[in-house]
């Protein structure tokens, strides 16, 4: 067996073992909240495993294993909420069961008794081991693993612990099943097409249409080939002549037997069919367990019932002090960089660029509406490079520090960001919107490629002599699952030759945004952040380590930069700037005397509205006055006339509605590309509040402060920092927490930086997720993730998608056919855990609304790349896959509708900026109405309901006295015609009115 030091996971293992010792099947309870149980008789993507004697079933439903008679009955829980088990398989003697479990922070193979007792971990380490199955003689377990650089089939000999690799190819081989005589293993083969344009770290979609079999010597043969769809979960029959499996396709799944269809019009779940005999299968479909006679006798239901624990969270949400006008210290300091002489710091805050002389007051360098980013000093400290969209798109500028003279050095229609001077100061490295890295010759203005496009790489840093460039880049473990570790990629600037550097084996940089690497000016060392602490490592001119990494801090650290030659490092720690000697020693704080004050609205205003939807009633009120004092509404009454003057807003031909919420945004993801346009795009479509569910923290804080201070135009922003992830990551801003100490540092950082929302991500184990939820609630922060159960038992506040990326590779909230069953609907109703709409396929409605592509708000405010993407989406909406996408959209909306009408919580959201900004929120609302919501119900998911969900119902979401004046002014009646909600003509945020023409004007000339 491969071995690996697990010191990093010791705390998590100790926690789970303690829980197991006190009762393995006990659910993890939330600290606070109203706990109850819900009985369910239908499950979403449930799986079953039949005992060898045919008497007992183990059912995997919502991440819990349940034992029940094979004839049906009440399920007995045999695993706990923190076990995170899946895909159980019986030993041939029926005495033990093997399964995959994530409770150690990676997928490992475990065994246990069928009643859940005597759990034993049989594989361990940094790799994922999945889909275990006993050999027919019970002496071995086959499983799939990424320990070889791609998924292969491995076999564990239980007596000796010896591991043997049965497959070894570049393909992804998984989901093994033994032949009845134990001489062969069949498995699914996933192949990725060659893609020369694939970015570094980016996956290519697998095609899994083949089942092959291999013997112990590696002799392989093709067993089954399908012409379409995706094969899942083969199961070799008892006589060796048949293999059962499931084929999935958009909105459809079917059980097949060696090429022929066994089911029709069933929502078959994609798990291993169970052979009751050579002529009978047990499987799960349509929320049920079924027994099917293969001789043509049809299928019979095996009834079951289980009780799921749910918790409705009860805590006081954070007070956002909307009426507090006192000065507040700036927390959002972005990209601080120390000057070469160590005397100054350049940074971005409150929407502008600043310079700070150590122990002096900051000095504002820019004073404009543009978004500045990524300051970088020249090696001699006389010039400062940065990005700004002051002339329409984000380009590179260089400022002479002494004179203040500034010149633009790039002018491409796209964005150029992340500047870094070469050691001789003659070249700027930078990155474009496609995440490729270039070198700009400052004398000639010519650019040349340095590093090919990578998946969300870090900023470039130069090695000595400008011969090597390094970036942080993602290195996935396989092509089957997208996650990997953020490592250092060093690239020869002349030849393009690439080499990977992992400073600590299997450890990830703390993100690819603020964790380095940063090469020292003398070229002898790199600084970087791992486990949220600052490290330095000696390297050669190519970036190869010449010594072990040295930890410089025990406190949280990020955004390192070098100064005083290579003798000091500046970094950020929980809102403070700190400087530490590169040789080690005590850090010192750099004071930043900078504050901001919330912007004030005009004194008294009267809005004469032709019609009003207040967010509560099911019909409009007509001819209404809305009276404001400052930011708040003081009266709403029938229009009285006689009001004239500059404090009167004439909306007599418009309908006033509460400003819309987009409850799923990553607002900083493309901010440096989109610049000031992004806020205007949102406001122009009536969005007055956005809810961040994952962003680089300091960028999010800067944005929140700049917006609240009136220094940037855009919606009110509930900000979150980076999601807390597990030992593997995907997006550049995810922060891994692979042990208890790392988790505690991350949670401490969240508390220090004053988040509004807490997000956990795909690879964080449930033991850590439960701690994060509890931590957030004790600080008034709602918690969101991609996972439904057991987080619904932990008191989690919501999920950001109906279904999205899962570490399992499948969803427990939506089936292959696009349905959710009683387990999801009833727990949603009982817990009130919110589900965000995030209807990606709503873009298929662009085929019905071509006018959106010609809307002036789109034509003027979108960048060329945004317009190109929108046009491609519109073409796809008329393409060959559009019909299937609409079926999937209808079924997804059906889930949301059923949750809402059963008393659950639905929030409208878009996953901005991954979908067309502004436009996509309205496509979500239109999709809801098209497939069964009333306009009133749809609008409430973007107004009153989110205000209640995020503790703001006393301030936002309705048009009532005492509420803040966040309003949209639209033509038409959106309660009768949901499309009218997009006919925005004016918008008001915090009592400040803007017309759509005023939002377009700064960008009218491109």
Residue ranges, per PLM feature:
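Divalent-metal coordination cores built from histidine and acidic residues
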Residues: 651, 655-656, 660-663, 674-798, ...
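A flexible loop/linker signature enriched in serine peptidases of the S9 family
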Residues: 42, 60-66, 81-85, 98-110, ...
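Acidic, glycine-enriched loop/beta-strand segments at the rims
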Residues: 613-625, 638, 916-919, 934-939, ...
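Histidine-rich, glycine-flanked metal-binding segment
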Residues: 69-75, 618-657
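C-terminal cap of metal-dependent C-N hydrolases
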Residues: 280, 562, 948, 964-1005
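Active-site neighborhoods of metal-dependent hydrolases
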Residues: 746-764, 810-931, 997, 1004-1006
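Short loop/turn segments that connect beta-strands within beta-propeller blades
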Residues: 69-73, 113-117, 157-161, 215-219, ...
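Blade-terminus and WD-like Trp-Asp/Gly-His loop motifs, strongest in beta-propeller folds
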Residues: 49-54, 88-96, 132-140, 176-184, ...
């Amino acid at each position: 067996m491969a071995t690996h030091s697990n010191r990093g996971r010791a705390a998590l293992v100790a926690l789970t073992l303690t829980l197991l010792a006190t009762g393995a099947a006990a659910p993890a309870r939330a600290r606070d909240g109203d706990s109850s149980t819900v009985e369910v008789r239908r499950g979403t993507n449930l799986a079953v495993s039949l005992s060898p004697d045919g008497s007992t079933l183990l059912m995997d439903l919502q991440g819990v294993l349940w034992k029940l008679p094979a004839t049906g009955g009440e399920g007995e829980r045999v695993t706990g909420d923190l076990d995170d088990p899946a895909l159980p398989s019986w030993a041939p003697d029926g005495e033990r069961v093997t399964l995959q479990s994530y409770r150690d922070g990676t997928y490992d193979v475990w065994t246990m008794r069928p009643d859940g007792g005597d759990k034993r971990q049989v594989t361990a380490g940094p790799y994922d081991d999945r889909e275990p199955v006993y050999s027919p003689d019970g002496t071995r377990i086959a499983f799939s693993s990424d320990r070889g650089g791609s998924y292969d089939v491995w076999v564990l000999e239980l007596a000796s612990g010896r591991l043997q690799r049965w497959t070894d190819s570049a393909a992804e081989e998984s989901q093994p099943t033994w032949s009845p005589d134990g001489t062969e293993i069949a498995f699914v083969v996933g192949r990725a097409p060659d893609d020369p344009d694939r970015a570094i770290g980016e996956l290519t979609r697998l095609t899994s249409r083949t089942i092959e079999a291999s013997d112990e010597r590696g002799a392989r043969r093709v067993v089954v080939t399908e012409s379409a769809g995706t094969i899942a979960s083969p199961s070799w029959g008892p006589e060796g002549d048949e293999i059962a499996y499931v084929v999935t396709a958009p909105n459809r799944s079917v059980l097949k037997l060696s090429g022929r269809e066994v089911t029709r019009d069933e929502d078959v779940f994609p798990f291993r069919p169970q052979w009751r005999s050579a002529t009978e299968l047990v499987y799960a479909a349509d929320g049920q367990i079924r027994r099917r006679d293969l001789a043509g006798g049809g299928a019979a239901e095996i009834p079951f019932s289980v009780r799921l624990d749910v918790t409705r969270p009860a805590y006081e949400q954070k007070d956002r002090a909307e009426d507090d006008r006192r000065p507040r210290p700036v927390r959002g300091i972005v990209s601080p960089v120390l000057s070469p002489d160590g005397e100054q710091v350049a940074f971005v805050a409150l929407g502008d660029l600043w310079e700070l002389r150590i122990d002096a007051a900051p000095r504002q360098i820019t004073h404009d509406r543009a978004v500045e980013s990524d300051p970088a000093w020249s090696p001699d400290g006389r010039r400062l490079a940065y990005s700004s969209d002051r002339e329409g798109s984000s380009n590179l500028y260089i400022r002479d520090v002494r004179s203040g003279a500034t010149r633009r050095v790039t002018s491409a229609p796209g964005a150029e960001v992340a500047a870094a001077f070469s050691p001789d100061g003659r070249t700027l490295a930078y990155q474009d919107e496609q995440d490729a890295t270039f070198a700009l010759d400052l004398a000639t203005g010519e650019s040349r490629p340095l590093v090919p496009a990578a998946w969300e790489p870090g900023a470039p840093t130069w090695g000595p002599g400008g011969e090597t460039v390094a970036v942080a880049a993602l290195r996935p473990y396989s092509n089957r699952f997208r996650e990997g570790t953020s490592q250092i990629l060093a690239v020869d600037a002349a030849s393009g030759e690439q080499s990977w550097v992992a400073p600590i084996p299997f450890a990830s940089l703390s993100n690819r945004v603020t964790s380095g690497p940063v090469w020292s000016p003398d070229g002898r060392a790199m600084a970087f952040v791992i486990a949220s602490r600052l490290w330095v490592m000696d390297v050669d001119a190519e970036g190869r380590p010449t010594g072990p990494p040295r930890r410089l801090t025990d406190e949280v650290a990020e955004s390192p930069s070098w100064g005083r030659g290579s003798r000091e490092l500046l970094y950020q720690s929980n809102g403070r700037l700190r400087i530490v000697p590169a040789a080690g020693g005590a850090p010192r704080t750099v004071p930043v005397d900078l504050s901001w004050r919330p912007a004030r609205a005009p004194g008294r205003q009267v809005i004469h509205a032709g019609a009003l939807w207040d967010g509560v009633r099911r019909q409009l009120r007509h001819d209404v006055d809305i009276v404001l004092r400052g930011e708040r509404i003081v009266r709403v009454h029938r229009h009285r006339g006689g009001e004239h003057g500059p404090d009167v807003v004439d909306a007599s031909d418009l309908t006033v509605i509460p400003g819309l919420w987009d409850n799923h945004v990553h607002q900083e993801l493309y901010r440096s590309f989109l610049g000031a346009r992004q806020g205007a795009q949102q406001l122009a479509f009536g969005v007055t509040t956005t809810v961040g569910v994952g962003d680089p923290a300091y960028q999010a804080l800067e944005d929140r402060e700049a917006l609240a201070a009136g220094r940037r135009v855009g919606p009110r922003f509930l900000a979150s920092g980076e999601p807390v992830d597990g030992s593997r990551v995907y997006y550049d801003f995810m922060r891994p927490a692979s042990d208890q100490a790392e988790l505690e540092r991350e949670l401490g950082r969240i508390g220090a930086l004053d988040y509004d929302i807490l997000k956990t991500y795909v690879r964080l184990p449930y033991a850590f997720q439960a701690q994060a939820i509890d931590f957030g609630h004790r600080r008034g922060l709602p918690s969101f993730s991609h996972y439904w159960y057991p987080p619904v038992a932990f008191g989690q506040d919501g999920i950001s998608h109906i279904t999205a990326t899962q570490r399992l590779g499948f969803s427990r909230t939506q089936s292959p056919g696009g349905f959710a069953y009683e387990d999801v609907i009833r727990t949603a109703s009982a817990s009130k855990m919110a589900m965000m709409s995030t209807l990606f396929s709503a873009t298929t409605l662009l085929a019905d609304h071509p006018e959106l592509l010609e809307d002036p708000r789109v034509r003027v405010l979108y960048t060329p790349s945004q317009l190109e993407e929108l046009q491609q989406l519109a073409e796809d909406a008329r393409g060959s896959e559009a019909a299937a996408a609409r079926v999937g959209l209808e079924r997804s909306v059906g889930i949301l509708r059923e949750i809402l009408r059963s008393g659950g919580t639905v929030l409208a959201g878009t996953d901005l900026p991954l979908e067309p900004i502004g436009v996509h929120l309205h496509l979500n609302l239109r999709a809801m109405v098209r497939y069964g919501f009333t306009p009133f119900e749809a609008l409430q998911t973007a107004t009153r309901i989110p205000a209640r969900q995020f503790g703001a119902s006393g301030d936002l979401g309705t048009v009532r006295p005492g509420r803040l004046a966040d309003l949209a002014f639209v033509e038409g009646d959106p309660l009768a015609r949901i499309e009218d909600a997009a006919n925005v003509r004016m918008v008001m945020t915090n009592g400040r009115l803007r017309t759509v023409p005023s939002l377009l004007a700064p960008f009218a000339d491109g």
